[in-house]
Amino acid sequence: MSAVAENIQTGMPAPILFTDSAAAKVAQLIAEEGNPELKLRVFVQGGGCSGFQYGFTFDEITNEDDTTMTKNGVSLLIDAMSYQYLVGAEIDYKEDLQGAQFVIKNPNATTTCGCGSSFSA
């Protein structure tokens, strides 16, 4: 199955990859919360050692300027400001010896910090 999510607004493949692994983990977390209305919000904000950092939270509300994508029944929300920094990125979920975490591979990042949670563009 393709890792490309569908953009709800256009029905076209989204320019942000939301992997099967990430969608499955989000579905598991939503089930644990017991609220099927939850959506994963991914955002970029100022901070971190490289200037910007990624954030993840659950949200029930879709804002007017949000881009909404769906993958395997899971919805992903990205606000307009964050979207410009995330176009072309891959949102994945990895489990390895170092632990389990959501990972963003972002081609727009000119530098990243050692922890991988902040970047500059």
UniProtKB/Swiss-Prot annotation:
The record's free-text note on cofactor binding: Binds 1 iron-sulfur cluster per subunit.
GO molecular function: 2 iron, 2 sulfur cluster binding; 4 iron, 4 sulfur cluster binding; iron ion binding
SUPFAM superfamilies: HesB-like domain (SSF89360)
Biological process (GO), any one: iron-sulfur cluster assembly
UniProt xrefs under InterPro entries: FeS_biogenesis (IPR000361), FeS_cluster_insertion (IPR016092), FeS_cluster_insertion_CS (IPR017870), FeS_cluster_insertion_RrpA (IPR023063), HesB-like_dom_sf (IPR035903)
Reported cofactor(s): iron-sulfur cluster
Keywords: Iron, Iron-sulfur, Metal-binding
Positions annotated to bind iron-sulfur cluster: C49, C113, C115
Pfam families referenced in this protein's UniProt entry, alphabetically: Fe-S_biosyn
HAMAP family assigned: Fe_S_insert_ErpA (MF_01380)
Protein family membership: Belongs to the HesB/IscA family.
NCBIfam families: iron-sulfur cluster assembly accessory protein, PRK13623.1
Assembly with partners or alone: Homodimer.
PANTHER family hit by this protein: IRON-SULFUR CLUSTER ASSEMBLY 2 HOMOLOG, MITOCHONDRIAL
Role: Required for insertion of 4Fe-4S clusters.
Identification of the protein by name: Putative iron-sulfur cluster insertion protein ErpA
